[in-house]
Amino acid sequence: MMNSKCGKAFQQRVRDMIPEMRRVRQIHFVGIGGAGMGGIAEVLLNEGYFVTGSDIMESAVTARLTSLGAKIAFSHAAENIDGASVVVVSSAIRADNVEVVAAQERRIPVIQRAQMLAEIMRFRHGIAVAGTHGKTTTTAMISMIYAEAGLDPTFVNGGLVKSAGTNAHLGCSRYLIAEADESDASFLHLQPMVSVVTNIEPDHMETYHGSFEEMKHTYVNFLHNLPFYGLAVLCADDDVLTELTPKVGRQVITYGFSEKADYRIEDYQQTGFQGHYTVITPSGERIDVLLNVPGRHNALNATAALVVAKEEGIGNEAILAALADFQGAGRRFDQLGQFIRPNGKVMLVDDYGHHPTEVGVTIQAARQGWENKRIAMIFQPHRYSRTRDLFDDFVQVLSQVDVLIMLDVYAAGETPIAGADSRSLCRSIRNLGKVDPIFVSDHRQLGEILDQVLQDGDLILAQGAGNVSKIARQLAETWTKE
């Protein structure tokens, strides 16, 4: 689907329209394997820049970038930035990182990931997707629709676009579709033509000084980065977005299950892991949508993508074909297969959701697609600060599964916080009395424990944003696939 449909002459005209960054020849990424960093690096490699980077471990992302010509070191050292014109960092990189300090001493510009994304977007028709949940999947869906329509977009996503086999692609058209990161408020650097906001919930509150009001105000500022002729596409089902809509001084179009939505979803049904529903447009047109990814949340994601495409003049045929063929985004309800275990057959699903709302919709989709079967979850909390801030919500949502296996918190560089660890979560969940969690301090024991508790027909959710995916996939390699 991602094969270019543009001629060489047109490709050259597009390149001529997009100026090179003057005096920039070598671009260095600190933490190049991180979500979003690798995608930007890939686009820049394909634009002809020399890209270097560093990370603490090898990954599929670093392997791909190396194959494209990037030079990557798997440790942090001052000499890694030798020759760099600019150093790009993500919010996960500390200010005292040796490469950041060396760059500052040498007066090499150090910029946020979103600032580099903004430069890529500057001379393109940008479509930015923000929100607490669903932005990776929505970005992937929009990208696939534009590709199906023959528009060959550039896209930069925070997760793998399965049908493209990558999370980034340099297209030959003027369109750029990008996931916008609110975690450090760096999405304020972007100046797109179209902005989508899927929902707003408290998360990454350290960025917003613990103030949800500040976070909401920042989202309004993000939408005001649109030109006066731009378009804001907002979810009508989200109470916070409904509250903020009157404050947005740009054209707004809404979507959702709400009767007040401009593009309204009706008659959603799920059969197995397939969803189908009808969208009623502002003109009264009825559009029947088929999805091969489950859950009402994915119907919302798909409808956001549909709205963007319809409002930008793409026909129904391309929209519906792309959505029907959509294979999902990496680690979003990713079905790893059905396996034969001592007590019977089980299905293993890998999912990135790490916020209580995300975990909840994943459980709901699993219940609808795996009716009358038990849901077993391997959960790995992500960050002590998130566990602390959303502790009670985690207790409630994790109590909805039938079997709960809890791994240690994936710290992501944070210092442990008393009362915000996995053992504390287990105690509170056990006290609620709905499920008796099993704490596993050494993931090497996970396979043995699973074989003790699993039953024939169980669906296993490997849930979290840390290395639980790697753990689950390594486990699956030792299991017999049906």
Curated annotation (Swiss-Prot):
Transmembrane regions: none
Annotated compartments: Cytoplasm
Pfam families hit by this protein: Mur_ligase, Mur_ligase_C, Mur_ligase_M
Keywords of this entry: ATP-binding, Cell cycle, Cell division, Cell shape, Cell wall biogenesis/degradation, Cytoplasm, Ligase, Nucleotide-binding, Peptidoglycan synthesis
Catalytic activity: UDP-N-acetyl-alpha-D-muramate + L-alanine + ATP = UDP-N-acetyl-alpha-D-muramoyl-L-alanine + ADP + phosphate + H(+)
Binding sites annotated in the UniProt record for ATP: 131-137
Pathway given in the UniProt record: Cell wall biogenesis; peptidoglycan biosynthesis
Matches recorded under HAMAP family: MurC
Functional description taken from the UniProt entry: Cell wall formation.
Database matches in PANTHER family: UDP-N-ACETYLMURAMATE--L-ALANINE LIGASE, UDP-N-ACETYLMURAMATE--L-ALANINE LIGASE-RELATED
Family per similarity comment: Belongs to the MurCDEF family.
The protein's name: UDP-N-acetylmuramate--L-alanine ligase
Organism field: Pasteurella multocida (strain Pm70)
Gene of this entry: murC
